[in-house]
């Protein structure tokens, strides 16, 4: 179509609009645009269905029987010719009448689903067959108990792909099977699942070596009832207000019972002690039927049981020495440990326990007495009395090796009362303890200045 024809068509359209201007404005005007009525829509659909289906009977509310101008076609007369073998097939309906066959009434509902199989054989309820035909198989439930059967009037489909796989290839040849799985979109390298009884462990299970701190390497295949040493690292101590509710639980999976505690038993402890000598008791013995706190308090009443806890003229320490860990909530005693932190705490605790007299001073005041002048003795005594009352600003012990700083430190706190926020600043002595409370502390060493250049 050239440009001249396009121009002529445009002119014809303009002439048509000018001649029918009133009719067009009445029908398609902006004020008259609306959908057709339901009656017009229904009649249009009936006309369309009557033309496509070719029915001669009158539809309710539609065309009449006498209207013979419409082309009539029957679906049952349609036929298709296969381009491959020239066979002519007949289109059949994929639905079945109710109560088809000799049965009068079928109580169970019949669900029919037509499925096309491309495996080269008929899919029946008893496995694959060697039939060369492919066809339509419908899965039925109710009448045929869910078995897969082949429709009797199934025909060859011309558009179906041909995949010729013999029975031997399907059963034995894995290469053909993988190729077939690849063409169908399945995973050809899938590993089949094998059932395995997990309740029976393997006889040759590997032995997993676990290392217990201070005890060396233990093997996992040791019997659960065998007694063994348990380190403090594998023990959790839970305390409460009720003494009878105290429990000692183990993280050690080989512990026989939650009421047995076996810690650091030496060969000397396993031998029975003599009647006349000192009883060689240890926390490593079995505790049953009583709370651990009562048992430990009974041992504290005997000065000979815990060396270093009695007066200065007590007997010679036993070997191995029993030591008390001050970091535990309960006074839990155990044999020696190689942890450097525990040894440092034990060293500090032993120095404090050596000064049991009334006139004795804590070790962290010795350096203060040596460094101050005689005129500050009263201040030092006041500091000592403050330390005896265990005030919160007690400086750190000398055994830690951290020097005590003299002076002031500036502290800043952001306060909030629910309506406004403000910042407060003040100075505290450097020897006082840092606390989250926004308040001023007192000097604990007696050598910090009363004011600094920040205080003004």
Curated annotation (Swiss-Prot):
GO biological processes: protein stabilization; symbiont-mediated suppression of host cytoplasmic pattern recognition receptor signaling pathway via inhibition of MDA-5 activity; symbiont-mediated suppression of host JAK-STAT cascade via inhibition of STAT1 activity; symbiont-mediated suppression of host JAK-STAT cascade via inhibition of STAT2 activity; symbiont-mediated suppression of host receptor-mediated signal transduction; symbiont-mediated suppression of host type I interferon-mediated signaling pathway
Any Gene Ontology CC annotation: host cell cytoplasm
Key words of the record: Host cytoplasm, Host-virus interaction, Inhibition of host innate immune response by virus, Inhibition of host interferon signaling pathway by virus, Inhibition of host MDA5 by virus, Inhibition of host RLR pathway by virus, Inhibition of host STAT1 by virus, Inhibition of host STAT2 by virus, Interferon antiviral system evasion, Metal-binding, Phosphoprotein, Viral immunoevasion, Zinc
Effect noted on mutating residue 274 to R: In strain: Isolate NV/MY/99/VRI-0626
Ranges where the record places region Disordered: 53-92, 265-324
Residues reported to bind Zn(2+) 1: 408, 427, 452, 455
Keyword Metal-binding attributed: yes
Binding-site residues, Zn(2+) 2: 431, 443, 445, 448
Matching InterPro entries: Paramyx_V_Zn-bd, Paramyxo_PNT, Soyouz_module
Intracellular or extracellular location(s): Host cytoplasm
Residues modified as Phosphoserine: 257, 350
Record's compositionally biased regions (Basic and acidic residues): 63-76
Subunit structure, as described in the record: Interacts with host IFIH1/MDA5, DHX58/LGP2, STAT1 and STAT2. Interacts (via N-terminus) with host UBXN1 (via C-terminal UBX domain); this interaction inhibits interferon-alpha/beta (IFN-alpha/beta) production. Interacts with host RIGI regulatory protein (via CARDs domain) and host TRIM25 (via SPRY domain); these interactions prevent TRIM25-mediated ubiquitination of RIG-I and disrupts downstream RIG-I signaling.
Assigned protein family: Belongs to the paramyxoviruses V protein family.
Function description: Plays an essential role in the inhibition of host immune response. Prevents the establishment of cellular antiviral state by blocking interferon-alpha/beta (IFN-alpha/beta) production and signaling pathway. Interacts with host IFIH1/MDA5 and DHX58/LGP2 to inhibit the transduction pathway involved in the activation of IFN-beta promoter, thus protecting the virus against cell antiviral state. Blocks the type I interferon signaling pathway by interacting with host STAT1 and STAT2 and thereby inhibiting their phosphorylation and subsequent nuclear translocation.
Misc: The P/V/C gene has two overlapping open reading frames. One encodes the P/V/W proteins and the other the C protein.
Name this polypeptide is given: Non-structural protein V
Lineage: Viruses, Riboviria, Orthornavirae, Negarnaviricota, Haploviricotina
Gene this protein is translated from: P/V/C
């Amino acid at each position: 179509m050239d440009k001249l024809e396009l121009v002529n068509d445009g002119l014809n359209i303009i002439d048509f609009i000018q001649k029918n201007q009133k009719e067009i404005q009445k029908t398609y005007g902006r004020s008259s645009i609306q959908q057709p009525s339901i009656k017009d829509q229904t009649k249009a659909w009936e006309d369309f269905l009557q033309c496509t289906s070719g029915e001669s009977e009158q539809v309710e509310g539609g065309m009449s029987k006498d209207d013979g101008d419409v082309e009539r076609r029957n679906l049952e007369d349609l036929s298709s010719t296969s381009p491959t073998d020239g066979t002519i097939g007949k289109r059949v309906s994929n639905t079945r009448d109710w109560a088809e066959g000799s049965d009068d009434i079928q109580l169970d509902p019949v669900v029919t689903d037509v499925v096309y199989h491309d495996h080269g054989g008929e899919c029946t309820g008893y496995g694959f067959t060697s039939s060369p035909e492919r066809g339509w198989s419908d899965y039925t439930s109710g009448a045929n108990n869910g078995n897969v059967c082949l429709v009797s009037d199934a025909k060859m489909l011309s558009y179906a792909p041909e995949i010729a796989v013999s029975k031997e290839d399907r059963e034995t040849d894995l290469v053909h099977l993988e190729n077939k799985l690849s063409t169908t979109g399945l995973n050809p390298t899938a590993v089949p699942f094998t059932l395995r009884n997990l309740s029976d462990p393997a006889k040759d299970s590997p032995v997993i070596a676990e290392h217990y701190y201070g005890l060396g390497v233990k093997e996992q295949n040791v019997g659960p009832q065998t007694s063994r040493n348990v380190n403090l690292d594998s023990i959790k101590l839970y305390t409460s207000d009720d003494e009878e509710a105290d429990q000692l639980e183990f993280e050690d999976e080989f512990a026989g019972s939650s009421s047995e505690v076996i810690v650091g038993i030496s060969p000397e402890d396993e031998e029975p002690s003599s009647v006349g000598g000192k009883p060689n008791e240890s926390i490593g013995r079995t505790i049953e039927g009583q709370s651990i706190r009562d048992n430990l308090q009974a041992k504290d009443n005997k000065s000979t049981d815990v060396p270093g806890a009695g007066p200065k003229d007590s007997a010679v320490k036993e070997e191995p020495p029993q030591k008390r860990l001050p970091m535990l909530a309960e006074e839990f005693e155990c044999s020696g440990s190689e942890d450097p932190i525990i040894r440092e705490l034990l060293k500090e605790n032993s120095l404090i326990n050596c000064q049991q007299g009334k006139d004795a001073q804590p070790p962290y005041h010795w350096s203060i007495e040596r460094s101050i002048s005689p005129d500050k003795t009263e201040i030092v005594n006041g500091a000592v009395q403050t330390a005896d009352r265990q005030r919160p600003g007690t400086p750190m012990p000398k055994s830690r090796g951290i020097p005590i700083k003299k002076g002031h430190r500036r502290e800043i706190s952001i306060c909030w009362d629910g309506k406004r926020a403000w910042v407060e600043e003040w100075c505290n002595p450097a020897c006082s303890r840092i606390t989250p409370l926004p308040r001023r502390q007192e000097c604990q060493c007696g050598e910090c200045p009363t004011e600094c250049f920040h205080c003004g």
